[in-house]
Amino acid sequence: MSVNMDELKHQVMINQFVLTAGCAADQAKQLLQAAHWQFETALSAFFQETNIPYSHHHHQMMCTPANTPATPPNFPDALTMFSRLKASESFHSGGSGSPMAATATSPPPHFPHAATSSSAASSWPTAASPPGGPQHHQPQPPLWTPTPPSPASDWPPLAPQQATSEPRAHPAMEAER
């Protein structure tokens, strides 16, 4: 009865190994026998393709998993597929691709004006605050007075707060002059 029990245990281990590793039953049996029926050792040998102390050099080739998703694709084929995916993505998903391209290209026309208004308002006082700390509003108007002719049409729609800060800056500049 002990021999049958060991045989049953071995058969259960083989079935479990086949389910876990995804290999054939004869491969599982050979690996388990070579690993002295130690499941983890046989499984590790199967996935790492390490040599078991017994010489099975020609057998190791047959023990490599054939149905695992980790099989690497052919590199040139993968590059071709990626290039096709990129090209088809831009053409097929034109509805979703063009808004992404539009958002990628449209902010630069808006960002330079927003950058000149908001970043200039935030960067010029910090750059000009060391020469005149109490004259915080004085450096802004001289820098803004040359620029309003070009973006003057964009300023009221973009930021009404900038328009309200502009009149405050001009009286402060004129009062200090």
Curated annotation (Swiss-Prot):
InterPro entries recorded: UBA-like_sf, UBA_8, UBALD1/2
SUPFAM superfamilies documented for this protein: UBA-like
Pfam families reported in the protein's UniProt record: UBA_8
Disordered: annotated span: 89-177
Annotated Basic and acidic residues bias: 167-177
Amino acid composition bias (Pro residues), ranges on this chain: 139-151
Biased composition (Low complexity): 112-138
Superkingdom of the organism of origin: Eukaryota
Similarity annotation: Belongs to the UBALD family.
Protein name: UBA-like domain-containing protein 1
Organism: Homo sapiens
